[in-house]
Amino acid sequence: MFSQTVSVAVTGGTGQIAYCFLFALAHGDIFGPDTGIDLRIYDIPGTERSLSGVRMELDDGAFPLLQRVQVTTSLHDAFDDIDAAFLIGSVPRGPGMERRDLLKKNGEIFATQGKVLNTAAKREAKIFVVGNPVNTNCWIAMNHAPRLLRKNFHAMLRLDQNRMHSMLAHRAEVPLSAVSQVVVWGNHSAKQVPDFTQALIHGRPIVETIADRDWLENIMVPSVQSRGSAVIEARGKSSAASAARALAEAARSIYQPKEGEWFSSGVCSDNNPYGLPEDIIFGFPCRMLGTGEYEIVPGLPWDAFIRGKMQISLDEILQEKASVSL
């Protein structure tokens, strides 16, 4: 019935992002309509009852692709021989919490998860990290899982890309399908770099349609950078459904790529074509090669505005890295 079966782990299984994401996963949005799924849903001890409710809903959804659904509070059981992991669970930033405090708390979580991945997951497993601060959490997990391939760790910048994509399409009054090569560099934070200089509308440079450089630099860029905070202020909660959709799209770009598609992802900077420091997780434009492997899109020019923003984002990533210990 199935062309293959993949074993998939999802952490933070009782949270809102996972709740939205799991149904897209079960529907086949990521691995396709012919791939069976052996699903393991993890959350911390004390969440057993909520986990059982999530499993009930997946059972009630009668998803043909779900060959097995296991809920667990054991990381080893969740990660055992998996092909892919979606690391969603993390400690949210609370009132009065400094970023360094958040880095410390989540650093411990992702160090533990990295160690278990290292012993339990398949060497070729792809790891998608969502929990914030996502670049540094991804870097911590990667460095605690040296048996796994470093190139297969991804920090999610797709939500930032989607936000930028939507804003550009609305401003240009064109369908989303008309906008391509939407690129977000750097850190998933308020210092990310939404790079409009690479974007195309109907295959032409964006400035031919949106000539207002002031809007691009001083309205669009900061709006994308601060969109997460704006959602929290308006909704009272952080992004969930849009984050889940972005995660599904990020993974689908790898498992079911469209020819020529660019996608933004936080990946290991080792041997990157832009001369950035190695051993960090940095947002780059990527594309699939048709072999199941991706490459960082090389040779893109940076004007003075983008170059300045890039340095700010790089400095933040390096500061975060220096503030945590492995």
Curated annotation (Swiss-Prot):
Substrate binds at R93, R99, N132, R163. Coiled coil: none annotated. GO terms for biological process: malate metabolic process; tricarboxylic acid cycle. The active site is at H188. NAD(+) binds at G12, G13, T14, G15, Q16, I17, A18, N106, Q113, V130, G131, N132. Pfam families: Ldh_1_C, Ldh_1_N. It catalyses: (S)-malate + NAD(+) = oxaloacetate + NADH + H(+). Its EC number is 1.1.1.37. PANTHER family: MALATE DEHYDROGENASE. Catalyzes the reversible oxidation of malate to oxaloacetate. Belongs to the LDH/MDH superfamily. MDH type 2 family. This is Malate dehydrogenase. It comes from Chlamydia muridarum (strain MoPn / Nigg).
